[in-house]
Every structure is written in structure tokens, then in C-alpha cells.
């Protein structure tokens, strides 16, 4: 993350280098395709000679080789049909952003890659990504569920491939029954009422990981409540932070009130997610917020659980991942790479991928293969799902916001101070973009 932020400040000459070779086969630096010239004319190979493509993907299987083998098997028919060879490289999560930064700065990036929204805008800003708009037919646009989540600056810079792991409010049905809570809460007020009943029965109502080192915890700790209060993080153009609205402050006050009223234990300020996970699995918590991918562990632990997709204040809202395929502008084979992206996103390909990594379908030509318990989230509650916007420098902004909210939970800042100071930093940073 730090390397990415530094790169946006110092530039590192990336705007020039993205015109270099991608996957070892890029066009010469400084050259441009003539307007109206079909990229296919640039990409034609001598009869019988295979076109080489480089694909970067992250690991989702139990080990890197499983991912590599899965994608190689999925892409084998595509290779045969298009006289090409696809080199699949699995990039570990631990150095994912650094790998992209280093490779693209030296002109050695892939033809087609996988990015999450938070990292995307910096590469768009430096011209490293090519929009997919000209490669999508009307039928494609009708087929895909989440194309809007890959639109940045009014262009289709990304095609969502993994949309899921929504953050939901889990509850322990056994504990709620013991506390006399007969109905799952739907609103903030009902949630507090349920917490009051749990506390009265000697049960820890709720827990949050305010001691966790990762600012990604905001996906559970603050962002859902901001959206539920009717707020948002940034203006649509990404030029201004607006989480210091009345809704943003209301969300912070609500969270802090849970601690003030004893529904969040004092230990919340030192807790990390793994500790909360173990507490819920151990039947010690009434509620926790977590991704849908945590459900199998809860079931295996013997917890009689259910969930609420989102509490409501002004509206419903919760975080969902929307990770995407991106087309690198330095690729010499854009047409074929875009064609490969659409092939990977076809129902047949996604069905094979989801056998390894269960996620919700991204298009209408695939049946639902994820946990049936969460099917309604993606089919009936899409309007409540929010992704983090692709805003340049947002990682540093989230870091400051998280630290100030942690200070709020420690009682060192008021909710107003935590939000307003974070927004002040954010808008000063955004003004430099």
C-alpha cells in the first residue's frame, strides 16, 4: 500500500513506461495506433505462430498450483480456438500491489490482470489501463450483473469477476432465544434493543475489532453504518470527501454509543478479527459483522447462526467486494486479451472457477453455486451492496480515518473530531490530485 501511495506522488515515470512491453510483447515506447486502425492488424501473426498472452491472477485455491491448473484448464479451449498460448501467473496476495507497481513501471506487466477497486484509480490516472467499452456488445451489457461497479470516470475500465463476500450481521440464534429476542433486528433501534436484552441476560451482545492492524476492518466497522445512515465516502467524481456529512457523523456517533451503553465491551479497542471469530464460533457473542465466507467455519463449530444482510437507518447498505479483470494499455494484443476476458467471464468458465472458489455469479448465463443461504443478497438486495470507489490516494485517506476512529473508540477524540479531522486530511490530499 505504501509503495502505491508513494508512486502516485513521485510518478516514477510510469506514464511513459506503460507504453512499453506488456508480457514481453508491448509496442515501442511513444508509438500510437493510428486512429481508426484495427488493433487486430497490429496483432496478426504469421500462419501457425501462436500469439503469447500473459494473465495475472491472485490465489483463491488451497495452493497456488490449484489456481494455475484451474485457469489453464479453463483457457485450454480458448487457446486452441484462437491459436494462442496463455501464460498464467498466480501473484501472491502478500506482495500483490508491489508486483503490479514494479512490473508496470518497467513495462513488464500482463496483457490481462486482476485488480481490486482501491488499487485501480492510480493506474487509470497514469494511463496504464485500457477501457473495455469498445469490446462490449449490447448482449454483453445485458448479460452481466455488475458492470456498473467497474465504471470509473464514465468508462468501463474493469469487468467484475469476483463480486461477493458481503459483510453481514451474523447472530447466534440460541443466545438470542435465551435473551428473549424472538425476531432478528432490522433497524439501528431494534439492534440496540436486542443488545440490551442480551446484556441483561449476561451475554456479550456484540464485538468489533478496533484493535486490528488492518484498515480493511473499516469494511465491517464503519463503512456499512455510513451507508446505512444515508452517507457516502466521496463525491461521484472522487474529488471531494463527503463522509463528514451529517450521515457520516451520525454513523460514528452510533458506533461510539454502542460502547458507551455497554453493548460493545471495553476490550473492543484491543480486539482483532481472529479473536472475534473465535468468540463467535465459541458461542460467546450475540452478534458480529463478518464476510459471508466465514459462515462455513461457524457451521463447523456448531453455531446455530443466521444473518441480517444490513441494518437500516435512512436506508440499507453494506460492503461487498468487487474485484475485476483489467486490460493493460501496454498490451500489444488488446483485442485478443479483451476476448479472453469475456471468455473467462462466460457461464461455463465461471462455473469451473466457482468449483474451486465459491462466489456469486457475475452474469445471467451461470447458475448460483455459492452458499444458498446468501443467494438472496445477490439476487434481491443488490441495491444495498456497495464497493469502495476507485479514488486516487484513497488508501492513505482510509488509513487516517481508521486511526482517528480508533482514537474515538479510546475516548481521545469525539465522533465529530474523528470524522472532521479525517475529512480535512482527505480533502487536502484530494486537492493535490
PLM regions with names:
Residues 86, 177, 260, 380-433:
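Conserved C-terminal helix/tail region of periplasmic/extracytoplasmic solute-binding proteins
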Residues 45, 49, 116-167, 192, ...:
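Hinge/lid segment of periplasmic solute-binding proteins
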Residues 123-128, 146-184, 210-236, 319-326, ...:
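Periplasmic solute-binding protein
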Residues 194-197, 237-268:
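Glycine-centered hinge/linker elements that transmit conformational signals in sensory
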